[in-house]
Regions:
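Short, solvent-exposed turn/loop segments enriched in Gly/Ser/Thr/Pro and often Arg
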Residues: 241-249, 309-319, 384-390, 413-417, ...
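Substrate-binding cleft/loops of secretory-pathway carbohydrate-active enzymes
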Residues: 316-326, 394, 402-403, 415-445, ...
């Protein structure tokens, strides 16, 4: 609760504001044009009427936008607003005792009871209008209010009743309220308003050195266009590269994470730095910085964006090691420690010490690295393992970058404990990796997605679903064959507005290190030989999914996800609809990659404004087939090999054309 000034006269109480992340410590997230619904409990002793408004503005601007809030039940008030600029904003609720509304209610009660001796009440109304005229700064409004004041002064009870309900008078009084005793919720709550791509985009990740799929030699930046064209043809919006910086020579890893490398082994891109430079340089085997700039330009001319991995690792050959040895961890004998995550050892990587005595210089240098790449056309950063660096650093550096470049997007690659993942999202990361890769059963998916989309997480945690990564090959994909890849693709593409695939997913690559959830012959350690059009690929299926995503607004949101009932534990059924019901999508997916599954799906007719028993049409957007359904209960059959999923567009009956039903 907060008031402008604490006095006995100021008795309006505002509490339980929603959304409000950790008492206002962290901002809510929205995108430009996306609605923010705000509610609060607003109360006052006695029976006086209240006026309540939702206010919002860009941080740093003096003037507020505002809209009236409506009372819903008891003392709960609600309103919604939209933001038109990619910038940080703030919002609050202001409320006050509205003497004119109270007068209107009191007058109506007395007049309705047959009391015609209302001179005192009319005089009171006249005085209220006169005081509002004194507050008005628009000449026309001032004159109109004075005229109403005069009319009330001279009115009889019957004419007074008409004036008390006069919409023009009510509007004028609302425009010039007495705010001398208003209460305002403080501290103001913040909103980060991002551009639309922060919510909706399809990502395609590939290692540029493997762009041509050659086994024994690497590709260069200028060899990447066919791979980018292929991703564009499949409907992807973002091209994402792992690190492109010079790779260390000392302790370079070999194939399959061997501790010894052979001549010609390219090394791990996450071991950044050698004699050719560090985080502000490119690996010479990929080309030059000019080549990189050219490639980013080519990506943008195709209507796509470029995302770059921001990895805070240094090889033993990184220039920082000689220039700033104090930035690293040291053993008792003075030598620099390499990274370890027992039982794993990373001899080719030196982690940075964010608590070193010169930490401010380190932080500034890492900020400069980000700014360097922003100035070279990078608009999105996928941040490697942010959970192993201080939260305070991320909160500071993201704010510093977005202060001048609010369009920059940060994706947190943090597969860690739930609360730490939430913390990273709260303190500024635009998007977050998730546990999606390990959620494969109906119960697991339903529980996890309900948490993401229907709890307070929806206000600050934006998921980005990757079925696989260069580090993760889930068991479901190792064993389920091509159908498993189709199943996971449709789930990722329709459950989350932001999703992506790592190259090779479209080829259904699924050979693991025995007993592990990692790829055998991973291209983290070697050049990857591939036929990009190998038989059995699912490129056409992914192309359809991305086309469906772009054409259906309901799939651009995640808070609208609702799980529905289907009589089979191996089939999952969920819906997404726009608020105006102009776009309604029903998705049914067979979660069993081996067997045909059947069941009755129950369509929530009332949610889509369809009368029970009324006909409606569903079109399978994957095949073009149309089905006329009637009633809640409808039969489905899904073959994982040929039809693992339905993505239905539901159309309601709008009329008849002769004997033909018309759906829209």
């Amino acid at each position: 609760v907060s008031t402008k000034e604490s006095t006995l006269e100021r008795t309006v109480v505002i509490e339980n504001m929603e959304p409000c992340i950790d008492g206002g410590r962290f901002p809510v997230k929205r995108i430009v044009g996306q609605e923010l619904k705000v509610s609060a409990d607003v109360s006052k002793n006695g029976h006086d009427q209240l006026s309540v408004v939702l206010k919002w503005r860009k941080i740093g601007k003096p003037d507020w936008h505002q809209t009236p809030m409506a009372q819903t039940e008891n003392d709960r008030w609600e309103a919604a607003c939209h933001f038109i600029e990619n910038a940080q904003h703030e919002y609050t609720v202001e409320a006050w005792e509205d003497a004119f509304k109270s007068w209107q209610v009191e007058y109506a009660k007395k007049y309705g009871a047959g009391n015609l001796d209302l001179r005192t009440e009319l005089d009171k109304g006249s005085i209220l209008a006169e005081k509002a005229a004194a507050r008005a700064t628009l000449k026309q409004d001032k004159e109109r209010l004075l005229n109403f004041s005069k009319q009330l002064k001279n009115a009889d009870a019957h004419f007074g009743a008409q004036l008390a309900k006069n919409p023009e008078l009510s509007s004028l009084m609302a425009a010039w309220p007495d705010l001398s005793l208003s209460t305002e919720f403080q501290p103001y709550l913040r909103v980060i308003v991002d551009r639309p791509q922060a919510l909706f985009a399809a990502w395609y990740e590939f290692f540029p050195r493997s762009a041509e799929g050659k086994a024994n030699s690497g590709s260069k930046f200028r060899d990447c266009i066919p791979r980018i064209e292929d991703a564009k043809a499949m409907g992807f919006d973002v091209i994402y590269f792992p690190p492109i910086h010079p790779i260390g020579f000392t302790a370079r890893k070999g194939k399959n994470n061997s501790v010894t490398s052979e001549p010609g082994d390219p090394g791990v891109p996450y071991a950044v730095g050698n004699k050719f430079g560090g985080h502000k340089a490119v690996e010479p085997e990929l080309g030059t910085l000019d080549d990189f700039d050219w490639l980013v330009g080519e990506i943008k001319t195709r209507g796509m964006e470029f995302a770059l991995d921001f990895v805070i690792n240094c090889s033993p050959d990184h220039p920082y090691v000689k220039e700033h040895p104090e930035w690293f961890f040291h053993r008792p004998d003075g030598t620099i420690k390499y990274a370890e995550n027992p039982p794993k050892k990373y001899e080719d990587v030196y982690p940075l010490n964010f608590q070193n005595p010169d930490w401010r210089i380190l932080w500034e240098e890492l900020k400069d690295v980000l700014l360097f790449w922003v100035q070279h056309g990078v608009s999105i950063f996928r941040v490697d393992n942010p959970h192993t660096k201080p939260n305070e650093f991320w909160e500071w550096v993201i704010l510093e970058i977005q202060k001048d470049y609010p369009d920059v997007i940060f994706l947190a690659e943090a597969f860690t404990r739930p609360e730490l993942m939430k913390s990273l999202a709260k303190l500024g990361f635009t998007q977050s990796y998730t546990y999606f890769a390990w959620r494969s059963t109906k119960g697991e998916i339903t529980e996890y997605l309900t948490e993401l989309t229907q709890t307070a997480m929806k206000y600050y945690f934006r998921p980005n679903f990757f079925p696989t990564t260069p580090d993760i090959l889930p068991t479901f994909l190792q064993t389920g064959g091509r159908p498993a890849f189709m199943i996971r693709a449709v789930l990722a593409a329709t459950l989350s507005p932001a999703y992506g695939i790592y190259s090779g997913f479209e080829l259904c690559e699924n050979v693991p290190v025995p007993g592990e959830q990692e790829y055998l012959n991973s291209e983290k350690y070697q050049f990857k030989e591939r036929d990009w059009d190998a038989p059995g690929n699912i490129k056409d299926y992914i192309t359809k999914l991305n086309r469906i995503r772009h054409q259906n607004r309901a799939l651009h949101e995640y808070e609208n996800l609702r799980f529905q009932t289907v009589e089979n534990e191996q089939i999952i059924f969920y819906s997404k609809a726009t608020e105006d019901l102009d776009n309604i999508i029903l998705v049914l997916v067979n979660l069993d990659p081996y067997n045909i599954q059947t069941g009755f799906a129950y369509v929530p007719l009332e949610s889509f404004a369809i009368n029970d028993g009324a006909p409606f049409q569903v079109e399978d957007l994957l095949t073009g087939e149309k089905f006329d359904w009637r009633g809640r209960r409808n039969f489905v059959m899904l073959d994982p090999h040929s039809r693992p999923a339905h993505i239905f567009r539901l159309r309601r009956l709008i009329g008849m054309d002769g004997e033909q039903m018309v759906f829209a």
